Amino acid sequence: MEEVDRILIHSLRSCGTEVPEDVQSIRQFNTELIVEAVVRCLRVINPSLGATLSHVLPPGMSARFRIGTSLAQACQDLGYPGEVGYQTFLYSSEPDIRALLIFLAEKLPRDSPEDAHQPAGKSALLQREIAATIKRQLSLPWLPSSCRICALRRSQNSCRLHRFHAQPLSLATDPTLKSIPDERKEYWQCYLPSVTSQLPHLPSVAASLLERNTSELSAKQEWDAEWKSQGLASRLSPEDYRSRKRQRLQKRIQEQLRQCAQLLAENHLPSSSSQDLTDMLKAFNLDGGSDQKKGSRFTRTQRFTYQQDPHTLKEQMQRAAEILPKKDAQDTDAEQQELSSLQEQIDSIEQEIRGLSESNKRLQLTVSQVEGEVNEMRQSCEEKEKIVRVKKRAVELLPDADNNLVKLQALVDASSHRMANLVGQWESHQVRLSEEYRELKRVQQEQEDESSRWMKDAKDLYEKIRGAADEAKRKEELYKQLLSEYESLPKEVSRAAYTQRILEIVSNIKKQKEEITKILSDTKELQKEINNLTGKVDRTFVVTDELVFKDAKKDEPVRKAYKYLAALHENCSQLIQTIEDTGTILREIRDLEEQIETETTKKTLSNLQKILEDYRAIKQENAQLLARIREA
């Protein structure tokens, strides 16, 4: 069967069926491949019969049953002698499909152009599809966006583009952190405006969010890179590493201040220089505190990652030692005292800065709350001012109330008279304008209907033209490719090879027939020999029984021998019967095994499962149809 399946698969591929390369037998055919193979064969055998059939199996169950019934009717019209129905294709069995495909392969025309050597395989099909798709896309004309239909319109201009203008945003961080004050958490929960409310222009929201996310990601990446390169080598925790860096920076600042103090002392500047240094340190600390939050990423990186080269620092110290004069012990003590006092001042200033920072945070929250209250009061004041202006105007009119009432009544009468005139004019114009509007609307509706009808006709015609052009190009390319492949192939090679293979199959069949005939003749000879031996045994027993029975009445040992002879004959008969029953049972076992194998090839369980799934799908489709009917 393997050779038969290979020949069938080659014939199906020559008819245009896309059989995968890994499929080597009919047993591996699925429902979709079976339907495609049968439809392709029908199209080659009888184009008018197979033109109305689709080679693609639809997803709906009703459509599948219709296609299965149509295929069965087409096969019966061709003269298929076996049983065929929709179940043959939807719930197939290997023997039935093999017999049907053999019948269709025999019906194929032997000298038809469709029977030429057509290239098969996924790679060739994929290349043809890619080439056809590219040519089809290149052949389409370019259309501006205003001339396209709504489904294909794309913005190809810059009318909707905006400048990338990012602004700072105030966003809440993780509220579970213990280092965040409760006042700030309350502000985030109750008073922090949304992102869209923080910016004056909506187009800046996306740019601001992207910039904020980019800055956070880059800061995190810089910290990760620094921690991997330097932090891990220090064997410290991240908090300790940051505190150590902060201490190093403070020491460096103190060293710079000390050097500045020494230079001031050498230049004999007034004693107020120490106070100036203190003010400078205070300003530096204040700026540093604000820069820790508001500095750019570059300044933060420079502040936390910058480290002076030790060799450069050593050279600077040596040059400073050469330039500065030698100091005596008294100057050294004075400098030490001054440094200690400066250190105390630095500590006190840092303490004050921390206190001021906390006060600043609380004041910021208070300011935000006060600003909200001020806004509410401002709105209330504006409303009251409007009321006061109205009342003030009324009070100004009170001294001359009679004349003012007469004037007001005259204004009201004039306004009423003018309103009546306007209403009359509007009514006179309304009728004419309404008629014109209805007429224009009717004309516009007719024009829209006519335009939609013309557009639909033009679209259908364009689709037909494009489909016909694509089909013509595809057939022309296929013809050229098949012609080139046909010319490159050697003539009569495949037919001679298949003829040789068929002759080999015929010779194998003859050998099998000879072996079967030999087995049958041997079986007949064995049966004949068994019958002869059985008859000989029966005759021998009858003669022996007669001879022994004559002497059994007179002699006791002969009587026992007669009994043993009868028992031996009975046991031999039972043994022969047991052997025959064993052979019958073995033959029945072989028959049952063949039946089991036959049923297994029919894929009964899988077909039953498919039937159950199709039944469920049909029930679901019926339920959907009933629901649609009820809705209608």
Swiss-Prot record:
GO terms for biological process: protein transport. GO terms for cellular component: centrosome; endosome. Pfam families: CCDC22_CC (PF05667), CCDC22_N (PF21674). InterPro entries: CCDC22 (IPR008530), CCDC22_CC (IPR048348), CCDC22_N (IPR048349). The gene is ccdc22. The keyword Cytoplasm applies. Belongs to the CCDC22 family. Its main location: other. This is Coiled-coil domain-containing protein 22. Coiled coil: none annotated. May be involved in regulation of NF-kappa-B signaling. May be involved in copper-dependent atp7a trafficking between the trans-Golgi network and vesicles in the cell periphery. Keywords: Cytoplasm, Cytoskeleton, Endosome, Protein transport, Transport, Ubl conjugation pathway. It is found in: Endosome; Cytoplasm, Cytoskeleton, Microtubule organizing center, Centrosome.
